[in-house]
């Protein structure tokens, strides 16, 4: 459909920014057992990797291929149920303490780990062990579970049961074990090492098939390329906090610095609500109840599990009783309005450990984290957004959303069963 009429389906600016393709994917992710240990490349790495594998004559559909396109794949997960996630390298001292507590085959890695920049190499060394070496590492971790903090042993023990000969279990020791409650979200940029362990969530991401896996999977792994993309950032990974906005009553926003990655949650129990308007298309997904959509020329009812596509600049009103998730593709100009807010909000995230059974004098580990924000994005002040609005010549509200005040495009909403 998009290829036949990219301007109509995407809008002029989105088509100019991304070409004749939908740059955003929205899906529900159900995790019954640990998913792969993975990271996603940056645009530069994806471009280089695609060219290299093309030159080698590897079919783009081949299962042993790592790069299938030239795009980055930032993503965001928002929990619908309780979720467990491994995300980002934990504090360096914590990682050192855990490796030493296990001892045995992990002691050499503990000695090598002296600064954050050593972490990618440690990951590569562990994941490059032969199968017998990986089995010995996991066996040592299993033997040491009783000596690890409970929140670490519970998470790592379950992974070890599933993958008894995969050194990804040891890499899991180096990652933050994060618990998400319904409504909590995590934004994962390029180079963030992560693994989803359990739960149900709504996931929005840039449209790319580039996944660099290192372990905990029967699928193709590419340890050298995975290590190349990893950064040395350590410490608890901040959650993306839902932000209300007076201009859009009843809508909670989850924003990121990536124009393709953003969510809005609309919980309907009373009056109808206008879906925020952008110059790009809108994806709508109902996860609870029944929602009624109305545009200029069409009405549509969606129940839980159904989705719809809103045309660019379309004015869509939702009513009913249920929960609707909205993914909107922002033009690059619109997305720039949110950069300042995202980085300012990230700077004020604070964390506290969930574990109460940790003897810090012995291991010094605050291992499982929940995040709180001391203020919301919408409270950071509108000045920077208004400046962007003036530069682009558009009427822009506090969240940097273009109103398209001069023209409401008659949007067609199409349902997907």
Residue ranges and their predicted role:
Residues 349-352, 357-359, 369, 385, ...:
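Intrinsic-disorder-associated, low-complexity terminal segments enriched in Asp/Asn/His/Tyr and depleted
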Residues 411-416:
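Short, intrinsically disordered C-terminal tails of secreted or membrane-associated proteins
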Residues 178-185, 296-313:
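Short acidic-glycine-tyrosine-enriched beta hairpin
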